[in-house]
Amino acid sequence: MSYLVTIIAFIIVFGVLVTVHEYGHMFFAKRAGIMCPEFAIGMGPKIFSFRKNETLYTIRLLPVGGYVRMAGDGLEEPPVEPGMNVKIKLNEENEITHIILDDHHKFQQIEAIEVKKCDFKDDLFIEGITAYDNERHHFKIARKSFFVENGSLVQIAPRDRQFAHKKPWPKFLTLFAGPLFNFILALVLFIGLAYYQGTPTSTVEQVADKYPAQQAGLQKGDKIVQIGKYKISEFDDVDKALDKVKDNKTTVKFERDGKTKSVELTPKKTERKLTKVSSETKYVLGFQPASEHTLFKPIVYGFESFLKGSTLIFTAVVGMLASIFTGGFSFDMLNGPVGIYHNVDSVVKAGIISLIGYTALLSVNLGIMNLIPIPALDGGRILFVIYEAIFRKPVNKKAETTIIAIGAIFMVVIMILVTWNDIRRYFL
């Protein structure tokens, strides 16, 4: 049963993170007028799909990412060229609405035509000889029109609906929006947790066994007001003061039953592993703070949690990248879907609150990792846009596509190696 819960939790976490990321791309793409033929969650074979307006929404088998397919985002060419024989369906204005490429269709009242001239980007027309009268005719293509092949519809994208022909700014927004939406999701989750759990105060809720707070006689309800020479008004002040006094003997003042008392104690030094490449030294008294529920503090606390998490993950990513050049790199520094599944399994056992917190951190991680300047990732593609903005011309399309393809192959190889390493670490 626990495996089933973990699998469901993993699917939900993966689905939410990828959906939010890809929706960010699609939201800004559509605002820029870019046609998005497909919105996919997962990779590989399609297991579910539905069409809404001009976009086909699909769920695919492999939980290793997702994508938004945008018109003009590649070297694809229209499947029709002069000399071909196709069938066309016309609307009441005698405009082409469907260009049928084979016999796998259910359309009626269609015309066969031998294409002599055509333009699917600017002037939108087909000129050719129709079978019914063997005469040459010129047909306009409707703004909303489709290629039909094997029963599937692919909407025709004029030049002004293509990603490649947009200005650098809407391109940048479209590419950056995926990570941006991951950051927004993380911030919302952190703030939501702060509202649900309350924000920590400097009042003692519970003391830990064999820690300085217990040994000094601190009790539930004691409100810490000063550590050494540092005034305390909220829980963050406790951490800041302890970072300064470290493990030196110090005086702690607190309020109990309306009276101010003081004790001397020595904070305990602890080492906490943050990531596979970094750890944190903290000095603690050993108490759990009481929480309070207010209107505005959770917003500030959630934002602070987001900044701390983002700083931690950014530092870890920079450290990982640096280790490639210093010789300290290990695949243990990375987690693929298998590693994330293992982490979700551990987090689920701690409860839904821990799972939400992990999802928030994972969302930050996804956003930051996607901004690494590798050609197949958002960060690499943003570099192409920056080049275009600086030099007032886009990178050669064929060169860009080749570089992105090489980057994609590199990412696939890395994903395979990381997945095998995760399987070896956690299950073998």
Curated annotation (Swiss-Prot):
Gene3D superfamilies: 2.30.42.10. The active site is at 22. This is Putative zinc metalloprotease SAV1262. Its cofactor is Zn(2+). InterPro entries: PDZ, PDZ_sf, Pept_M50_Zn, Peptidase_M50. It is a multi-pass membrane protein. Belongs to the peptidase M50B family. The chain crosses the membrane at residues 172-194, 309-331, 352-374, 401-420. Keywords: Cell membrane, Hydrolase, Membrane, Metal-binding, Metalloprotease, Protease, Transmembrane, Transmembrane helix, Zinc. It is an enzyme of class 3 (hydrolase). It comes from the Bacteria. The keyword Ion transport does not apply. Its EC number is 3.4.24.-. Zn(2+) binds at residues 21, 25. It comes from Staphylococcus aureus (strain Mu50 / ATCC 700699). It is found in: Cell membrane.
